[in-house]
Swiss-Prot record:
Name of protein: Probable inorganic carbon transporter subunit DabA 2
Taxonomy of the source species: Bacteria, Pseudomonadati, Pseudomonadota, Alphaproteobacteria, Hyphomicrobiales
Keywords: Cell inner membrane, Cell membrane, Membrane, Metal-binding, Transport, Zinc
Gene: dabA2
Membrane topology field: Peripheral membrane protein
Binding-site list for Zn(2+): 352, 354, 536, 551
Family: Belongs to the inorganic carbon transporter (TC 9.A.2) DabA family.
Length: 843
């Protein structure tokens, strides 16, 4: 018997309910598909709340921990990472209502115990959670897990982007309608003992909002708790909810609206209601009544004093971060004296601000006299859609915060239009043949015959793949092209219409972009004879998350196209004439080179060197020798973290890892990232920052209206914070914010991975990306940002941009200012207020 009587204080399908649905959906952070897996702040939906309140809320609503276990902090205290002064500073900064001891010694005593309070904080329960708590055996627990598995199975079929051989019927319908059409023939739930499942779903309204309202009413969710309940329901299918949030993000970026996530929410709450309808027994209904009474209590997310254990862990986390900032500021204070500017550099190399570039830049500067390196976002200020040969649409090579402004097509150099057409036709034909062959191998009948008859023919391929001699699959970037053509591929910047769209750059656009990029990099002279614009990518095999190791500023793709486009435009003689009229004089003998830094092997590839004049042959030879030395030094430094012993074969082992299909840690990615520094390179040159800092060159004295400062704080700084918080979340709670064990991953729908063969879509980073099997390689620290600019200018950017204000005022990062003398002089305290620091001290 189903209790259809609506209790008091519930919501009907009103604008208030629609608002609760929208807010619950916006609490979910998006996750990008595997083809362009970019780092995302898992707390993005809580940017309007403080870090502390968000941690409390997630613990209250979903019992999700966002801090490390207390044993982690105890170990940091024992090994000297956290000092007594750090604990004292954290206590002094803690709000008074946290009811903490005033002395560090007392805090140390409390930290020795894992828990001091008895009562856990209140939670907003879902039907699944109450069922799990009451389960006398495994059956009801299995039902709640079964619900997640069934929703995930349906989502995998509905959202599939070409992996499945058989397409799901009704994919043309919107999600809620498509799911109800699917359920009409799905007897799995009833076989699991969920009586009348299909009838219960059919009884729901056709409109998804009305269906949510019906469930809210029948469950008796208190009006105050509706948003929390809906949020908790989404968290139980958090991976697929995150993918639906990505679809919503993309539509909103284009000025449209998408309700996929809201419809997925309707599917989840209706599913939960079918479980509720099974239990009419007194024990369950009494437990549910108590849960709803608890949910009706007003939350106190901003008043943490009622949960002393949470407060202790939070202040220990603060002390842990203070300890890092103390060491960082001391290191920066010991920087060598800045060299006098003005002399022409021997070589200039612009790298992405990615923390992996810091190691290579330091190595490059140490092995060559007159080497000048620059840090800038890896898309080099060119927000392009790059369209490979044979594709109708392209890939966004820019931060996901932006939309591409230009379309650039890939082309084979030195060909006529007729040859281009032949190359295109041949590539499409080969890809179709491969697709047909794959379909044959995977078909229901031929798969068995194929394995029996042709399996041995692949023995050589399996052996060569296992020995890391060959790739396990064709490189999708060059699939279907002849080897002699691959080396001639490159972006075409000449303007021409393609498929009814304008592509390339006209003369005015080239000049405007060239000036903007050079000024944003603070690169206005003097210029070296060779200037490297170095994007980055990675080389791995059998790695579903491979794009996550590529350039985040390029939307999860390599920075090759952007670097080559920028170099081609800056080498344009007409552009240089126009730049001279705008105050940027690039010498005639300066040549820009598009380059690509492979962060797995630390090899730098130089493009279009055949276009170098003969006068630069010696320059090129010296550059290659310098890069070889820098590569060797960088590999040796990274080898220690990879667990590779130093020796004659060290460098070869680094390269071998990039081709090893069994390697779960081909490189460490951005593990360890902890700081972002926007200042002239002179402030950090010669300092070993351990590959943990995003380094963005910025000279505020060249930034007349502080437009570049605004660009840095609203784009690269925000992206760096996203990366930092993704690593933070995947470290403190990999089950909730990470992707689990990479060894167990199975790709689903080409969109993401499952851990095993069922369960929710995984988000975030695999465990192997933050842990080496015995210890954490990534330290869970919020980003420390240091900017050399006047306080008034920084405040101006904060005041004008909500996205920045929320980050700094709500403590999602720590902001510091560097004085014109190069000293870290002020700490941001919120609401446009700063505290002056004493020299070489931490607050």
């Amino acid at each position: 018997m189903i209790d259809r009587e609506a209790p008091a204080a519930v919501l009907a399908p009103t604008p208030l309910l629609r608002h609760a649905i929208e807010r619950a959906c916006r609490r979910i952070a998006p996750v990008w598909p595997l083809k362009n897996f970019v780092a995302v702040n898992p707390f993005l939906g809580f940017s309007d709340r403080s870090f502390h309140a968000t941690c409390a809320m997630l613990h209250r609503v979903a019992r999700i921990d966002t801090l490390m276990p207390r044993a982690f902090y105890r170990e940091a205290i024992r090994n000297g990472t956290i000092e007594t002064a750090d604990l004292a500073a954290a206590l002094a900064a803690a709000p008074a209502d946290w009811r903490l001891p005033t002395e560090a010694a007392e805090l140390l005593k409390l930290a020795d115990n894992d828990r001091i309070a008895r009562k856990p904080p209140a939670v907003v329960a879902t039907v699944a959670e109450v069922l799990n708590e009451l389960a006398a055996g495994d059956r009801h627990v299995a039902r709640t897990a079964f619900m997640t598995d069934e929703i995930s199975r349906w989502c995998a079929a509905y959202f599939d982007e070409g992996q499945s051989v058989w397409r799901m019927p009704a994919r043309g319908l919107r999600p809620y309608a498509a799911w109800r059409a699917w359920v009409r023939y799905d007897r799995n739930p009833e076989m699991m003992g969920i009586a009348r499942f299909r009838a219960l779903v059919a009884d729901m309204p056709d409109d998804y909002v009305a269906a949510i309202a019906t469930v809210i009413e029948r469950l008796g969710i208190p009006a105050r708790a509706v948003e929390d309940y809906l949020h908790q329901a989404l968290l139980e299918i958090g991976g697929w909810a995150a993918y639906a949030r990505y679809l919503m993000w993309n539509h909103e970026l284009a000025g449209d609206r998408d309700d996929t996530l809201e419809q997925l929410l309707a599917i989840r709450v209706v599913w939960g209601y079918t479980l509720f309808a099974q239990r009419t027994d007194t024990a369950f209904r009494e437990a549910w009544r108590r849960a709803m009474e608890q949910a009706a209590l007003p939350p106190l997310d901003d008043q943490l004093g009622g949960d002393p254990d949470f407060c202790i862990n939070m202040v220990l986390q603060e002390a842990y971060e203070i300890a890092f900032r103390r060491r960082l500021l001391d290191r920066l204070a010991g920087a060598p004296a800045a060299r006098t500017a003005g002399a022409r550099p021997a070589v200039q190399a612009a790298f992405c601000i990615d923390v992996r570039s810091e190691v290579y830049r330091r190595a490059m500067e140490s092995v060559g006299d007159g080497v000048e390196t620059v840090g800038f976002a890896g898309f080099f200020g060119f927000p392009i859609e790059f369209v490979p040969i044979g594709h109708v649409t392209g890939r966004a090579h820019c931060p996901v915060l932006l939309r591409p402004q230009f379309t650039v097509c890939e082309a084979v150099g030195g060909t006529s239009e007729e040859e281009d057409s032949e190359i295109l036709v041949m590539r499409l034909l080969r890809r179709r043949v491969r697709k047909a062959w794959k379909s044959f191998k995977l078909s229901a009948v031929s798969s068995f015959i194929y394995v029996e008859t042709a399996g041995l023919l692949f023995a050589g391929k399996i052996l060569s793949d296992s020995l890391a001699v060959t790739r396990t699959v064709h490189d999708p970037n060059t699939d279907g092209l002849d080897d002699d053509l691959i080396g001639r591929l490159g972006p075409r910047i000449e303007p021409r219409p393609v498929g009814g769209r304008a592509t390339g750059f006209d003369p005015a656009q080239r000049v405007a972009m060239a000036e903007a990029v050079l000024r944003a990099m603070s690169m206005t002279g003097p210029f070296a004879r060779l200037v490297m614009l170095t994007g980055h990518g990675s080389t791995t095999v059998n790695n579903p998350h491979a794009s996550g190791l590529d350039c985040g500023a390029c939307g999860g793709h390599t920075g090759e196209a952007n670097a080559r486009v920028a170099a081609a435009i800056l080498n344009d003689p007409d552009v240089r004439v126009a730049l001279r009229q705008r105050g940027i004089d690039i010498p005639d003998d300066t040549v820009f080179l598009g380059c690509l830094h492979d962060t797995t092997t630390d090899v730098i590839r130089l493009f279009d060197i055949e276009q170098l004049p003969a006068s630069h042959a010696d320059d090129l030879r010296r550059l290659r020798a310098l890069l070889a030395k820098a590569t060797s030094l960088t590999r040796l430094e990274r080898a220690a973290l990879l667990g590779i012993a130093r020796g004659a074969a060290t460098e070869q082992q680094v390269v071998t890892r990039s081709r090893d299909w069994a390697q779960v840690r081909p490189e460490w990615g951005l593990a360890g990232n902890a700081s972002f520094i926007a200042a002239p390179r002179a402030r950090t040159r010669g300092i070993d920052l351990g590959g943990r800092s995003f380094l963005h060159d910025y000279d505020w004295q060249q930034d007349k209206d502080f437009g570049t400062l605004q660009l840095i704080m609203t784009a690269p700084m925000v992206v760096a914070s996203w990366i930092n918080l993704q690593y933070y979340g995947s470290t403190v709670n990999n089950a909730a914010f990470g992707a689990g064990n990479k060894v167990l991953h199975n790709v689903v729908g080409t969109l993401g991975v499952l851990e095993g063969n069922a369960g929710d879509l995984k988000v975030g980073l695999p465990w192997q990306s933050v842990h080496d099997g015995s210890r954490f390689v990534h330290e869970p620290l919020r980003l420390t940002v240091l900017i050399e600019a006047p306080l008034e200018a920084i405040n101006g950017v904060i005041a004008k941009n909500d996205i920045v204000r929320e980050l700094v005022d709500h403590h999602w990062l720590h902001l510091y200012a560097i004085s014109p003398q190069g000293r870290v002089s002020h700490a941001y305290r919120g609401h446009l207020l700063w505290q002056q620091l004493e020299e070489r001290s931490e607050s």
